[in-house]
């Protein structure tokens, strides 16, 4: 980028809000370094924050309020001016942002697949019957129960290092993690196998970094524009459109994955019951040049899932989750 294309009125300082986990800080530092390279005269800082999602580790997200627990404190910092932007793993961002906030940039995507991690076994198929497998999401839990019913699937909370420590001390025979996080932290060697998307369809936005801002900050949006990867953003928008249309959240084993092939965006969506007894899937593809195109593609897939009965599954799971939260209040 040359001086003629730089946004006007660059600030003296830009502050990035981030969770304080090692992975979250890596992501914030990745954005910070990119901004420093673009704007060397600007002092880019990171404001580390602890979110409620980081603090509540004894219950699954579906029972304590969902993905918004990881972003609310960061959004408060955006709203009151303590931070100019917030960096998120997009799979942790609610499908509908609160009023007054916007997703300003999606960076080039890392590997969206799930990873099988174990100290003793090479793959899910190699695990003996009754082996304990840990996962942090209902989506992965449903996948495991559907494809590997002989395994003992149990919840696994905590940041990436905590989850690996629980595996290493013998609490689990294996755990399922996002490949992107392991690769970003230089832990790719811990991956024993990458799960094919046909076997474990990723969460919407998995592997992508999103940068959120206060919607009123058009200036920040302009400064972030060079970081935006259009192809990744369209894929993520299509995926999130599936989940958004169905009311997807942590209460629902819902997956969506889009990939570019031959100039077209190919999108697959899936909804299942938590026990894996019923799995619905739909696929569509189209040429997508704009966010509206990606949204339309997502709606085609969500409509196809609804015709198969996805709405009844989603509504039942959301109602059950609400009852569980009420009972635990």
Swiss-Prot record:
<dbReference type="InterPro" id="IPR022419">
    <property type="entry name" value="Porphobilin_deaminase_cofac_BS"/>
</dbReference>
<dbReference type="Pfam" id="PF01379">
    <property type="entry name" value="Porphobil_deam"/>
</dbReference>
<feature type="modified residue" description="S-(dipyrrolylmethanemethyl)cysteine">
    <location>
        <position position="250"/>
    </location>
</feature>
<comment type="subunit">
    <text>Monomer.</text>
</comment>
<dbReference type="GO" id="GO:0005737">
    <property type="term" value="C:cytoplasm"/>
</dbReference>
<dbReference type="InterPro" id="IPR036803">
    <property type="entry name" value="Porphobilinogen_deaminase_C_sf"/>
</dbReference>
<dbReference type="GO" id="GO:0004418">
    <property type="term" value="F:hydroxymethylbilane synthase activity"/>
</dbReference>
<dbReference type="InterPro" id="IPR022417">
    <property type="entry name" value="Porphobilin_deaminase_N"/>
</dbReference>
<protein>
    <recommendedName>
        <fullName>Porphobilinogen deaminase</fullName>
        <ecNumber>2.5.1.61</ecNumber>
    </recommendedName>
</protein>
<dbReference type="GO" id="GO:0006782">
    <property type="term" value="P:protoporphyrinogen IX biosynthetic process"/>
</dbReference>
<dbReference type="Pfam" id="PF03900">
    <property type="entry name" value="Porphobil_deamC"/>
</dbReference>
<keyword id="KW-0808">Transferase</keyword>
<dbReference type="InterPro" id="IPR022418">
    <property type="entry name" value="Porphobilinogen_deaminase_C"/>
</dbReference>
<comment type="pathway">
    <text>Porphyrin-containing compound metabolism; protoporphyrin-IX biosynthesis; coproporphyrinogen-III from 5-aminolevulinate: step 2/4.</text>
</comment>
<dbReference type="InterPro" id="IPR000860">
    <property type="entry name" value="HemC"/>
</dbReference>
<comment type="function">
    <text>Tetrapolymerization of the monopyrrole PBG into the hydroxymethylbilane pre-uroporphyrinogen in several discrete steps.</text>
</comment>
<comment type="similarity">
    <text>Belongs to the HMBS family.</text>
</comment>
<keyword id="KW-0627">Porphyrin biosynthesis</keyword>
